[in-house]
Structure formats: C-alpha cells, structure tokens
Amino acid sequence: MKIYRVGGSVRDELLGLPVKDQDYVVVGATPEDMIRQGYRPVGKDFPVFLHPETHEQYALARTERKIARGYKGFAIYATPEVTLQEDLARRDLTINAIARDEAGNIIDPFGGIADLQAGILRHIGPAFVEDPVRVLRVARFAARFGFQVAPETFELMKEIVHTGETEALVAERVWQEIAHGLMEQHPSRMFHVLRECRALARILPEVDALFGVPQPAHAHPEIDTGIHVMMVIDYAASQQYPLEVRFAGLTHDLGKGTTPPDEWPRHIGHEARGVELVMDLCERIRVPRESRDLALLVARFHGDVHRALELRPSTIADMLQATDAYRKKVRFQAFLQACASDFHGRPGFADQPYPQAEHLSKALQAANSVDAGAIAMQLGQSHAGDTDLPMRIKRQVYAARVGRIKSLLSNP
C-alpha cells in the first residue's frame, strides 16, 4: 500500500500559496485494508476514508468510465491494481494532477509543473469533455490564478456546451461553483471565460444578456452593461465584501437586459423588471436565501440609494421599512456595500466618495432611536378598545421616524 498527497494541496504548495485541505490517494489497497488500519469509510459514490487521527480524506486509486450524461454519469473502478498514473489521468487539468509521495518526491506525469510556471490551464486528455462541471471549474481557476486557458482546452469547453452537456448540471453544483468563483480575487475573469466558451448563455442567460447593452455614457464611461457588472463584482472583491454582496452586484442590473433596444441607452424601470429576473435565476440554481434576499433588495432599490441625498425624509423611511433595515441592520450594511460597489464599478469612480451610504446609515440610526414600544403603550392606554389601534400605532411610529430623519437632515 502506497500513499500519495495529490491535487490542490500539491498545486498550491508549488505556487507558494497557503495549503488548506489535503487529499490523499492510496494505491494497492482494498476497503477492507483501510478499515483494518482504522480508517473510517465515508464515500457514498466511491471509496473514500477519513484518517483515524487527522480526519483527512484518503481515497482509493480509481478510474472512471462515462455511462450517462452529467457529472454523476460515471462508473467507478477502484481496485488495488489501479496505478497512481491511472488515477491522476482521470483529473481535469494538468496542474491538478501532480502528486507527492511519502518521501516528498514529486510525481508529475502530465506536465503540470510546466503549466504552473507558464500560467496555463490545460486539460489532461479527451475524457475532459465527459464532465460538464469542468467548464465551471476551469473558469473558476482562471479567476483564482489569473492563468490563461490553453486554446485546445477552450475548444473542448465549447464542445461540452455545444453538445448540451451543461444542461445536465445539477443546480446546486452550478451555484457552488458560481459562489466559489465570486469569492476569488478577480471574479470577473470567471464570467469572461464562461462567456468566451459560450457557457454563460446556457448557465446564466440573464447575465450574458447584459453584454452589448449600452448605458448613458455620462454616467457609465464603460457604456456596456456587462462590462459594468464585471467591474462591480471586481470592486466588491477588492473590498473583501462577503458572497451575498458580490452576488447582489452580479445581478443588480439584470433588468437592463430586457430594455427594448429602441429605448437604449436609458433603462427606465429596470429596477422593477430586474426583481423578477433575479427571483427566477435564484430559483433555477438554488441560491441560498441570504444571497437571494439581498440580491432582490439591491435590484429593486439601488437607484433610490444612489439618489439618497435628494430623497424626502418620508421616502427614506419607506425604504428603511421596505428593506427591513430596522430588524436586519447587518443585512442593511451589506445592502449599502452592494450599492456602493455599483457606484464604484465604473472607470474613474473607484476612489470617488459615496456619501449616500453614510447618509442612509445615519438615517437608520436616527429612525431607530424612536421608542416604538413606548408609543404602543401610550396609545394602548389612551385608545383602549379601539379596533384601529394597531394601525394607529403603526402610523404614529412611522411619523416619529420621519420626524427624526427630518431633524437629522435639517442639522447634518
């Protein structure tokens, strides 16, 4: 039995990056051998075991054979006769098919080190086309490392899309890869790669539709809506904003993709149109509730936030209520981060001030100083038995909040 460290940990080590999870391949062993040595079986689709002390994953060397569409359509063959090279050959890219033995020696049968040095993402063999998830993974690695995709690998990615294999992707896996890509240092790179191999139109057609849609040049020097959205998510990444903010940045302008061309470059009503598109996208790829809810709010209200300095106190109070800012203060700050990213995601605007965010934060603080409980108690005593009492309390609290915001704006 021989044990090799493989995959991402070896790759990242060679790149001088922090190593997180470590995966191992075991050659020349059976499941019974592993169990006898104290390893705990956890693999459902193929033999994977947890080390009895470190709890790191150890998988038996295996080969795979395509038997059906999709990334789960494989027959697994794992026996002691499977060699390390055969196991490495089933992997997606050369840079992910490097191993290190227990003595520290590197095994690199497919030229992965040379591709790391050259900054190239290259597939290992023709079996690359059998797993549509690899299209997303290659795009994600492009965003992570800034590497170029080898031309021949790009052609295979296009083939995967053309044959309809991406249609078999499981929604949750699509979201998982998109989420990972959004959290990279330059997430726009992922979407440019997906668009270049024509996968973006299949996976996120609402985002793909934004490219080529013009905006007013005086407000958007980049003009192209798709380019703008890419700048927004890159800005959010540069600020290390969380996933929810980055996803909201990706989807905030989806409504512009449905503007009739004869109305370009204006996009009146795109916020309201975008809400339905965001909801449909989130349902289709199973976006988690936290990311979905923030994206919906940003799509609907980002224009109002940009105009915050011009809004009446009552309009600001309405927005705070509609965004549930009184109860969800942390989410409201994420909401403002996404809107700020929209503002900064334009050529020449990255370092410009965005006072709207602080303006609305102070407005929320002022409105929150209203003691709704005290108002309810006072009205409950003076209007006992009034069937309209709940609505009366609501109106009184609202008026008090508007008053506090008005006072703030009068004395900045």
Swiss-Prot record:
Binding residues annotated for CTP, in chain numbering: 8, 11, 91, 137, 140
SUPFAM superfamilies: Nucleotidyltransferase (SSF81301), Poly A polymerase C-terminal region-like (SSF81891)
GO BP: RNA repair; tRNA 3'-terminal CCA addition
Catalytic activity annotation: a tRNA precursor + 2 CTP + ATP = a tRNA with a 3' CCA end + 3 diphosphate; a tRNA with a 3' CCA end + 2 CTP + ATP = a tRNA with a 3' CCACCA end + 3 diphosphate
Single GO MF descriptor: ATP binding
Record keyword Hydrolase present: yes
Residues holding Mg(2+): 21, 23
Positions that bind ATP: 8, 11, 91, 137, 140
Domain called HD: residue spans: 225-326
InterPro entries cross-referenced by the UniProt entry: CCA_bact, HD/PDEase_dom, HD_domain, NT_sf, PolA_pol_head_dom, PolyA_RNA-bd, tRNA_CCA-adding_enzyme
CDD domains reported for this sequence: HDc (cd00077), NT_ClassII-CCAase (cd05398)
Keywords noted in UniProt: ATP-binding, Hydrolase, Magnesium, Metal-binding, Multifunctional enzyme, Nickel, Nucleotide-binding, Nucleotidyltransferase, RNA repair, RNA-binding, Transferase, tRNA processing
Cofactor binding note of this UniProt entry: Magnesium is required for nucleotidyltransferase activity. Nickel for phosphatase activity.
Family (UniProt): Belongs to the tRNA nucleotidyltransferase/poly(A) polymerase family. Bacterial CCA-adding enzyme type 1 subfamily.
General function of this protein: Catalyzes the addition and repair of the essential 3'-terminal CCA sequence in tRNAs without using a nucleic acid template. Adds these three nucleotides in the order of C, C, and A to the tRNA nucleotide-73, using CTP and ATP as substrates and producing inorganic pyrophosphate. tRNA 3'-terminal CCA addition is required both for tRNA processing and repair. Also involved in tRNA surveillance by mediating tandem CCA addition to generate a CCACCA at the 3' terminus of unstable tRNAs. While stable tRNAs receive only 3'-terminal CCA, unstable tRNAs are marked with CCACCA and rapidly degraded.
Further details from the record: A single active site specifically recognizes both ATP and CTP and is responsible for their addition.
The record's note on its domains: Comprises two domains: an N-terminal domain containing the nucleotidyltransferase activity and a C-terminal HD domain associated with both phosphodiesterase and phosphatase activities.
Database matches in HAMAP family: CCA_bact_type1, CCA_bact_type2
Record's subunit section: Monomer. Can also form homodimers and oligomers.
Protein name (database record): Multifunctional CCA protein
Source organism of this protein record: Nitrosomonas eutropha (strain DSM 101675 / C91 / Nm57)
High-level lineage: Bacteria, Pseudomonadati, Pseudomonadota, Betaproteobacteria, Nitrosomonadales
